[in-house]
Amino acid sequence: MTRAKANVEPISFPPPRAGEVPRNAAEGGRTELPLALPFTNPPSPILIEPLVRAALAEDLGRAGDITTDAIIPPTEIARAVIAAREPGVVAGLIAAGLAFKLIDPNVQLTVRAPDGSEVTKGTAIAELEGPARALLTAERVALNFLVHLSGVATATQQLVKAVSSTKARIICTRKTIPGIRILQKYAVRCGGGLNHRFGLDDAVLIKDNHIAAAGGVAASIKALRGRLGPMVKIEIEVDTLAQLEEALAAGAEAILLDNMPPELMKRAVAITNGRATLEASGGVTLERVRAIAESGVDFISSGALTHSPHALDLGLDFL
């Protein structure tokens, strides 16, 4: 039976909140330390479309959706709702919406809980109407993006809430799933976190293997200063207080405290005394993050936000 098509709004997103910094359409540009960017507006569909197309091509294979095409008439119109099956934070509607639109541009998606929204079990996130074949064919790819990115946003918000009333801000890292970093970084922002560098080209971060290859902390910083000049801000990773003092003496503007216990971080904060931005990294869990924040560091970075978040349980049901 063919259902009458109702008038529904096309997919749309709210404008950036006051104080947010928009990125350009290419997500380009460079930023200086501190490496934290407070914006939540979604990345351009121009950048997202190739990722969604690749996911659809992977799912459709050579023959397409042979089950749906065999049993659903091409004229069948259907309505569906995407709803939360557990509490969390929504992220990824831009990718989910594109998945349906790329299968059939006649699909209409109405957002009920925009990206960045906190939802409870049963909350309607979006409503869909259009060719039933398109809804069925795009369903899994759309949900794959949505449950993963909402999981990233939810995990981020949990850390953000845990460090509330401290000065520490939660940031993500480059430990992302290959190919979808731009979406994962966006999901972190939806959860209230901030972004560290997007790639190797937009900020300097001297890691432990750089130090080993270059011959030490001071040697690494000196080499960078000679190559990049005095205007480029330098962040360097240290795991001892001796390395911290060496980095400060060499003029590092930001220092990453790698896998230090909170007690040692407190000493690092006292030694630094405001001379550099301090980032804590390593072993960041929901149980430990408050103690890390109370050490007095400026930023807390977590790779787990993007490399191993729990997927938020969401479902799509026909009405």
Question: How would you name each of these model-derived features?
Answer:
Residues 3, 36-250, 254, 263-271, ...:
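Acidic/glycine-rich phosphate/pyrophosphate-binding loops and surrounding catalytic core
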Residues 3-6, 16:
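Compositionally biased, low-complexity intrinsically disordered regions
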